[in-house]
């Protein structure tokens, strides 16, 4: 056998016996360095071209002083070097700012990070979106590992570590994903503080073949690639705060680090670490492909809507010109810019826009001819006037739902509607867009179906191929404009003023007219994945914050060609409604002074209660109406109703728009609520099957209490034929009792204290968990739902195994489409409670009947088609149930549970899913014990002996009772999240609460699939009040891994836990035990990730061990064969050598003989 044949055999054995990456090994040499960072290196507001001396807002952040740091801070960042000597730094694009270098890899690649820490404290590097083992996680927390497995958790000053990450198929982009997915990496010793200090950078993982062979590799599928971090960078959390005070404040001793204005001055509203347009120019060519990789990081205020002026984007196949971004949210957007010019990118959340979160991008023609717009449609003319009016937020004078007067003393509404010498009441001067017949502006255009619009301007409608001509007449006392979303326009028709090098009259002064021309070319219209019509908005942008709070906003509808009838209405839709959810802040209105003067207010009383006065002027409105004063929205049972929902405002404007009584379809997914943020828009379709009078409200509890409610009425109309009756199957019965218990949010503090390596008093959790100094600690009396075996309510269902993780939640109620769910409810608590479910068809109209203490009630929930998964959903959808006597106080008292509805044939007789191996339901909620029914009892039981010493309005006391919990547990005290390697897991992710309940939930070490018509890869779930998501995972990585909310305050407050993946060996030994005990094999059916790709073939999970065993056996055989062949070759080689030696000896002998002769 030749040596080449032996080499071939050894290579074949290697390829069979090992499962290495078949891609590239990409080495990155990163150093952690301290730097001085200037947030505004140009020294001015570039957006307005004003100096800091002329810009009071910019100077409040950027000018240093006696007790102000200014715009320059010491930071710590990642830098890239050419090799392990760390002497030659690799330059990066200037627009990356203080972000670390871009890391790139394809499916099958290995990334080796050679990290060296040149800074003064320990740091790490932790990635999202890639595969790693325990020695390369880069995250410090108690996980049971030790020794070399902990070396990655904290790299000390002067130390180094090599991190090994890979991109297997289970972490790579799916078929439906874009070619490259957006991820990040960051330090994770104390992640919130490390990131605030500057240690964060971008990472992309791409489909195979996307990157070229250059060094560094470049993408072959796009022409330009940009990475933008939108974040309110809180320098108060930086490890260098003391250094920055000492260096940049002229009188460091005068600084009070707890002073509110000082802290505000250190919160930099930045894009890549630049504010007020100081981001170096982002340049690109028109008609070229651009990939925008957008991500966020930060705290509860980090609700960002990135608005790209002048162009449109595609995100997951949907048309938009905005991207909503939250902490640890990653967005990949695609653009082909058409309009050349200098354009604005800004976060249009009002407070962020004012504070400088803006930048420019420049589109050059690059010698390309301008594209010819395919405009074959109509020219649609609109004549719109800005008109000043007196607006009444409560014109009917009472709550439209309860009938109570809005001015009744002590009621909720009287805060906003009681007029006095220190309150304006419910009527304000505002300005509104109004439609007219023609350019003479003499005759108003009235349409009966638009009476519900309220403060909104008229609906502007257009189809793909149309041109929109808007003649705007400003009859108001301030300069105003019209700025649209969702259409194309030249610079002369933009409506926003900024330093773009042009001088067009974009804004109409008082009693001036301006004409705007907007177009809808095919590339701006709805995509194939979009509904027939997309909801957009137009608004005045002379001063976007003050203009919109003054009232200037209206809806815009862009439809596919042929979607509108001759009357301009959408075909195939019986009714359409446009609803704006926003907190109108009258303190920010142009007419604030006029309103105070008209109210004849007492300036002395105002000065005594500034905060209360300003709060009374924040009107939580739907189309400018509070407390169900919006004219009733009437529809018929069986109608196809289009709800066009719009958001506007500031970071508090996080609205979960809930439709009681019926469900919605959003992009083919079944929902009971739609999420809105400032400058985001939703098109939702409803086909109501439940007659009655129902509420529309914001799910955020404080917004609902403040009046963000309306009423819609579903009637059985004679003109509509009844749809075929739903056939319901046999009932599933649940026996549930409300009982009062002592609940401990954190019974074991060892994990928390080990993680932060500190004493109880110095821990982040001290304020929540200590019962000293007038605080209550971690124990509270609560009411919970618990399941029993039958109607005697004597034997509780045990909470072990699959139910252990539920914690404070009630039982997981399951059903299929066509089921009747019967809930027998006994109230063993001391006050009335009920059970109300989202998504289902309840037998009673309105809110369910309450059970008095000791009473037993039976609730019946029917599960029609519209309660189950939509065409774009997973096999099951998640809902929630809770007590609804007082929905807010009941839920905070503990009465909440999960509900799952599946397609037919998914559930086994025992209730489990046949397409999943594990199911977990997790509620991420800040339990506000200040709003619990049991607060007084808890103070008496767990508070100080002298309860009079407790100040219920004290800020520390209020904060201490807000428990940032996962299923009611803090700091990894939740148990039962255990899966086995290779198992398929469904995670039902739930959120309720207030506008601060923004939760971005990150799974370490694992990725999951999110279904939205297609499968998309992610490792973070975005949750908001009233949202319920389902994500699916195949557990692949054995270990104890962290799961946590990525919002800064929530991390420190304990919203984190551990989920454990056990290895194959443990899995199959457990499966054998279960098989012997139950005599039943677990059914493993194929779902998206249920196959593992080995040797180029898709292998079902259940066959992985068999194939692995076979491969090992083959490897052993091949190894023996190779050794035998090697022995043969070695023997043959030795024999040949011996023969050569014999010949040599014989030859030498013959030579000697010849010499002798």
Swiss-Prot record:
Where, in this chain's numbering, is Ca(2+) bound? 134, 152-153
Enzyme Commission numbers on file: 1.16.3.1
Q: What is its subcellular localisation?
A: Basolateral cell membrane
Specify which residues bind Cu(2+) 2 according to the UniProt entry for this protein.
128, 186, 1046
Annotated Cu(2+) 1 binding lies at: 126, 1002
Ranges that cross the membrane: 1110-1130
Q: How is the cofactor bound?
A: Binds 6 Cu cations per monomer.
Tissue-level expression reads:
Highly expressed in small intestine and colon.
**Which cofactor does this sequence's record say it needs?**
Cu cation
Taken from the record's topology, the Extracellular segments are 24-1109
**What are the cysteine partners in each disulfide bond?**
180-206, 285-366, 533-559, 636-717, 876-902
What residues bind Cu(2+) 6, as annotated? 999, 1045, 1050, 1055
- Where Cu(2+) 5 binds, per the record, is at 655, 698, 703, 708
Q: What does this protein do?
A: Plasma membrane ferroxidase that mediates the extracellular conversion of ferrous/Fe(2+) iron into its ferric/Fe(3+) form. Couples ferroportin which specifically exports ferrous/Fe(2+) iron from cells to transferrin that only binds and shuttles extracellular ferric/Fe(3+) iron throughout the body. By helping iron transfer from cells to blood mainly contributes to dietary iron absorption by the intestinal epithelium and more generally regulates iron levels in the body.
- PANTHER family for the chain: HEPHAESTIN, MULTI-COPPER OXIDASE
Name this polypeptide is given:
Hephaestin
Organism from which the protein derives:
Rattus norvegicus
């Amino acid at each position: 056998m030749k040596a080449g044949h032996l080499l071939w055999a050894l290579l074949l054995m290697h390829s069979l016996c090992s499962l290495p990456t078949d891609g590239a090994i990409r080495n990155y040499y990163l150093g952690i360095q301290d730097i001085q960072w200037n947030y505004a290196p140009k020294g001015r507001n570039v957006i307005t071209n004003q100096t800091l001396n002329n810009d009071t807002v910019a100077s409040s952040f950027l000018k240093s002083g006696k007790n102000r740091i200014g715009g320059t801070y010491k930071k710590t960042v990642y830098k890239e070097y050419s090799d392990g000597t760390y002497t030659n730094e690799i330059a990066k694009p200037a627009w990356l700012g203080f972000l670390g270098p871009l890391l790139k890899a394809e499916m099958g690649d290995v990334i080796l990070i050679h990290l060296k820490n040149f800074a003064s404290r320990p740091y790490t590097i932790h990635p999202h979106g890639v595969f790693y083992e325990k020695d390369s996680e880069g995250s410090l927390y108690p996980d049971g590992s030790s020794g070399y497995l902990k070396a990655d958790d904290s790299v000390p000053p002067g130390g180094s570590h090599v991190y090994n990450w890979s991109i297997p198929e289970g972490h790579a982009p799916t078929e439906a994903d874009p070619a490259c997915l957006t991820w990040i990496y960051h330090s994770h010793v104390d992640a919130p503080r490390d990131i605030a200090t500057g240690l964060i950078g971008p990472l992309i993982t791409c489909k195979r073949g996307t990157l070229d062979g250059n060094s560094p590799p470049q993408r072959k599928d796009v022409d330009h690639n940009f990475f933008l971090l939108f974040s309110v960078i809180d320098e108060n959390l930086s490890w260098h705060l003391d250094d920055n005070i000492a260096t940049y404040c002229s009188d460091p001793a005068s600084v009070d680090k707890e002073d509110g204005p000082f802290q505000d001055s250190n919160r930099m509203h930045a894009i890549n670490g630049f504010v007020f347009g100081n981001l170096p120019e982002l340049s690109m060519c028109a008609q070229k492909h651009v990939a925008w990789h957008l991500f966020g990081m930060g705290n509860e205020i980090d609700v960002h809507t990135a608005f790209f002026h002048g162009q449109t984007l595609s995100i997951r196949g949907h048309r938009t010109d905005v991207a909503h971004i939250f902490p640890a949210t990653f967005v990949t957007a695609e653009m082909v810019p058409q309009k050349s010019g200098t354009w604005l990118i800004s976060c249009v959340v009002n407070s962020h826009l004012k504070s400088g979160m803006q930048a420019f991008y420049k589109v050059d023609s690059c010698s390309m001819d301008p594209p010819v717009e395919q405009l074959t449609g109509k020219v649609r003319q609109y004549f719109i006037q800005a008109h000043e009016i007196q607006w009444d937020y409560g014109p009917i004078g009472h709550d439209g739902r309860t009938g109570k007067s809005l001015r009744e003393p002590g009621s909720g509404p009287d805060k906003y509607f009681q007029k006095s010498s220190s309150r304006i009441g419910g009527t304000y001067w505002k300005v509104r867009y109004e439609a007219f017949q023609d350019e003479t502006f003499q005759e108003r255009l009235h349409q009966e179906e638009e009476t519900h619009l309220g403060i909104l301007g008229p609906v502007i409608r257009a189809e793909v191929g149309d041109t929109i001509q808007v003649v705007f007449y400003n009859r108001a006392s301030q300069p105003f404009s019209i700025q649209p979303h969702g259409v194309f326009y030249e610079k002369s028709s933009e409506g926003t003023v900024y330093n773009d090098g042009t001088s067009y009259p974009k804004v109409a002064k008082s009693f001036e007219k301006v004409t705007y021309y907007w177009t809808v070319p095919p590339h701006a219209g709805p995509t194939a994945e979009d509904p027939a019509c997309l909801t957009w908005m137009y608004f005045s942008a002379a001063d976007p914050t003050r203009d919109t709070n003054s009232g200037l906003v209206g809806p815009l509808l862009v439809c596919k060609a042929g979607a509108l009838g001759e009357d301009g209405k959408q075909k195939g839709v019986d009714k359409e409604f446009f609803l704006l959810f926003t907190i109108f802040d009258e303190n920010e209105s142009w007419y604030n002074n006029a309103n105070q003067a008209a109210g004849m207010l007492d300036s002395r009383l105002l000065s005594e209660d500034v905060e209360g006065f300003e709060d009374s002027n924040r009107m939580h409105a739907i189309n400018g109406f509070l407390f169900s004063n919006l004219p009733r929205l009437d529809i018929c049972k069986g109608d196809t109703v289009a709800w066009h929902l719009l958001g506007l405002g500031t970071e508090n404007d996080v609205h979960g728009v809930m439709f009681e009584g019926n469900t919605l379809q959003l992009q083919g997914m079944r929902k009971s609520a739609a999420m809105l943020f400032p400058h985001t828009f939703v098109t939702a379709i409803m086909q109501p099957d439940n007659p009655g009078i129902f509420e529309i409200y914001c799910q955020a509890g404080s917004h609902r209490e403040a009046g963000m409610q309306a009423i819609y009425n579903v009637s059985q109309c004679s003109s509509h034929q009844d749809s075929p009756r739903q056939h319901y199957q046999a009932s599933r019965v649940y026996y549930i009792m409300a009982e009062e218990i002592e609940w401990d949010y954190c019974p074991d503090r060892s994990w928390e204290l080990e993680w932060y390596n500190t004493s109880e008093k110095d821990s982040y959790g001290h304020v929540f968990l200590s019962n000293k100094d007038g605080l209550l600690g971690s124990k509270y009396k609560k009411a919970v739902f618990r399941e029993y075996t039958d109607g005697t309510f004597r034997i509780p269902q045990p909470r072990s195994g699959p139910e252990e993780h539920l914690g404070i939640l009630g039982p997981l109620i399951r059903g299929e489409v066509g089921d009747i769910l019967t809930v027998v409810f006994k109230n063993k608590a001391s006050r009335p409670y009920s059970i109300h479910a989202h998504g289902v068809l309840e037998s009673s109209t309105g809110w369910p009947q309450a059970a008095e203490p000791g009473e037993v009630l039976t609730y019946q929930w029917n599960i029609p088609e519209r309660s189950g998964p939509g065409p774009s959903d997973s096999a099951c959808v998640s809902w929630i149930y809770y007590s609804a006597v007082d929905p807010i106080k009941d839920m905070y008292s503990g009465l909440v549970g999960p509900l799952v509805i599946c397609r037919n044939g998914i559930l086994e007789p025992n209730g489990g899913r046949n397409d999943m191996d594990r199911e977990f339901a997790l509620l991420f909620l800040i339990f506000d014990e200040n709003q619990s029914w049991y607060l007084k009892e808890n103070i008496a039981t767990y508070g100080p002996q002298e309860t009079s010493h407790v100040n219920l309005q004290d800020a520390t006391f209020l904060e201490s009772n807000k428990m940032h919990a996962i299923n009611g547990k803090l700091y990894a005290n939740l148990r039962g999240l255990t899966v086995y390697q290779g198992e398929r897991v469904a995670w039902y992710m739930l959120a309720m609460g207030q506008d601060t309940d923004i939760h971005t939930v990150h799974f370490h070490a694992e990725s999951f699939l999110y279904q939205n018509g297609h499968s998309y890869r992610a490792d973070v779930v975005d949750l908001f009040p009233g949202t319920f998501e389902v994500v699916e995972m195949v557990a692949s990585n054995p270990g104890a891994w962290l799961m946590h909310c990525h919002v800064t305050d929530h991390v420190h407050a304990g919203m984190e836990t551990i989920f454990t993946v056990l290895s194959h060996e443990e899995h199959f030994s457990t499966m054998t035990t279960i098989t012997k005990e139950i005599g039943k094999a677990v059914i493993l059916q194929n779902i998206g990730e249920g196959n593992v790709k080995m040797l180029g073939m898709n292998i079902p999970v259940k066959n992985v061990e068999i194939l692995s065993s076979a491969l090992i056996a083959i490897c052993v055989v091949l190894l023996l064969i190779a050794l035998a062949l090697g022995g043969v070759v070695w023997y043959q080689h030795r024999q040949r050598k011996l023969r050569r030696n014999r010949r040599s000896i014989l030859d030498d002998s013959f030579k000697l003989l010849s010499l002798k002769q």
